[in-house]
Every structure is written in C-alpha cells, then in structure tokens.
C-alpha cells in the first residue's frame, strides 16, 4: 500500500472539522485526500442572524459537499449538542438547558433533541455526558453532568441515551474514565486526577457501566492523567485504561473515540512520532480533529495522518490492530442512518421550546 493509500486509510479512523459555512480549498483538499469517515460541526459551520430556511439550505449544501469531496455516501455527521452552553446551532433549534437541570425530563428532552438533529442531517450526538459533578471547582464539566452522585448521573445519562436511541441518533458516553472531579480544563492543559482504580470503580465508572449495559455504541476518552493507574500517559493513550478497564473489565465492545486531538492536553504529544500507534494499541478506534481551537491547523491533521502511515510502514503500528479498529467503525457505520436535511414544522419547534422552559420551572 502506498503512502497516499495509507493516508487515506487513516480517514477510516478520522472525524474531521470543517472551517466554515462552506468548503474552502483546504477543506476540499483534506476531504479528498484523507477521506475522513466523519465530520464534526461547530457554530462556525452554521450561518447565524439569518432566517431558518436560509441557514438550513446553506448547511444542507455543506453536508452535500462533504460527501462529494470525501467520496463517501455514508459518513458520521456529528455534533456536540448537550444543551446549556454546548449548543452549536442557530435558532429556532431548541436551546435546552444543561443536563443538570433536566432531572426527570432527560428522556423527553433527548427525544426532542434527536428529532431536531435528524432534521439537520446529523446522525451522531457527542452525548450524554457520563461524568459526575463531584468537584464544585470543575471549570469544564460542572452542570454539563446529569448529577453529583453516581446514581443521579447514571439515571440522567441512561434516560437521555434512551431518548436519543429511540429516535435514531447514535450517542456517545463521555469522558472516559471520568472528567467530573478535575479542577483544570483539558482544552487548556492536562488535568491530573490522583484516583485509584478502586476509586474509579466506586464512583466514576458507574454511569459508564450503566450506558454499556444499554449497549451505547461509542465511548469518548478523556485527556486526563491518572498517575495511580497509568503514570506515563493520559487516558486517551493508556492501554490500562482503555483496554484493561474499558474493554476487559467493563465489557465494552463498541467504538472508542478520542476527544479532540487539538486540545492542549494532548496536542503536543500527538505531534510526536509514534503517538498515533500508541493510541491505536491502547484501544482507540476513531480520532476527532476539530480544527476549532486557536492552535488548530490542517498541517497538524496531515502530520497525524503521516505518523499513522509511517508507523504502519515501519511496523511499529500493528496492522491487525488497525484492521480490528476499522472493522468496529465500519460495522457501526453500516447501521448508522444517513438523514436528509429537512425543515421542522412550527408546531414541533414551539412544543420543544415549551419543553425546554418546563425544565427550568
């Protein structure tokens, strides 16, 4: 297999960000050369301040062009869409409140959210958050979690995922093995959590266990160092955490996806040769490169793809490990609906807005 083919084969494991509301030349080149199996959208990909039909048609064109240039009819079209401040879409898509406020409404909110996501052509929501709001000083999770105990976090995440699943949206539990007790933001630096494996079993892992029992198809890693468990690398690169704990101990058989590789917690280490190989060997199947952070660049994305190619060529990356990861991803893609973009009726939007208000009363 040539270097070019190898770079394209990395696309089988890549969820890539797009630069704006339409494809620029860099986007077209990356989609055509890397052929990512999925894309992740952000607020920058939606026209704002214009009528609903206008921005929706523009977004439809964007998704159509992504498929055209990547030469993929079936792709993962993904969105961070938790509610609260983690909402990327313009109005009139409903602004549901934070997970922590949903309480008994989690199931119906997720069903309403899924209906709206399908209308946007989205098939994967990077939710529910399975972290526990256990540290009041947490700058990044906080009220994004469904509760401050293993029980309340589990119940909310379970009901939310049930709602997504029933309406045909793939969910992803995050951030494994738990980001709720940190006091730093992994977008900005590498958090360190001095928890033992037993600590995780007694608290952090419980919501993930609940979602695994419901056969959630995706679990997203946390860019966090757990020195008592694996002092060498963050969870995204840890075979102990992803293989020994997530795969073997918890029995997860689905797709393991990295959090964004552009985040400061891991951005530098992924510029080092051999890091992608280590992530695959640890257990990662899919990698998100958002191109949505100040330090992001397309050159970084290509460097990661080139490291993948070089590692396969020199034998430091086991081709069998890559093939097993590819099979897991392809198996999931085969059952992932490809939704057309469509306009929601006013009655549905008003009903969903009223539901959002009722969560806060």
Could you tell me what each predicted segment is?
Residues 10-12, 37, 71-75, 121-123, ...:
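Short, well-ordered coil/turn segments that N-cap beta-strands
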Residues 2-17, 158-160, 167-170, 174-176, ...:
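Mobile, glycine- and charge-enriched loop segments
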Residues 62-77, 147-170, 203, 235-257:
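Alpha-helix-loop-beta-strand connector modules within alpha/beta enzyme cores
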Residues 1-37, 248, 267-361:
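Preference for extracellular/luminal or secreted protein segments
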Residues 33-153, 175, 180-193, 222-234, ...:
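Enzymes and membrane/adaptor proteins characterized by extended Gly/Ser/Thr/Asp/Glu-rich
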Residues 152, 156-177, 183-186, 196-218:
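Phosphate/pyrophosphate-binding betaalpha-module
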Residues 211-231, 254:
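Oxyanion-binding "anion nests"
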Residues 28, 114, 157, 161, ...:
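Generic hydrophobic/aromatic pocket-lining and core-packing "Φ" positions
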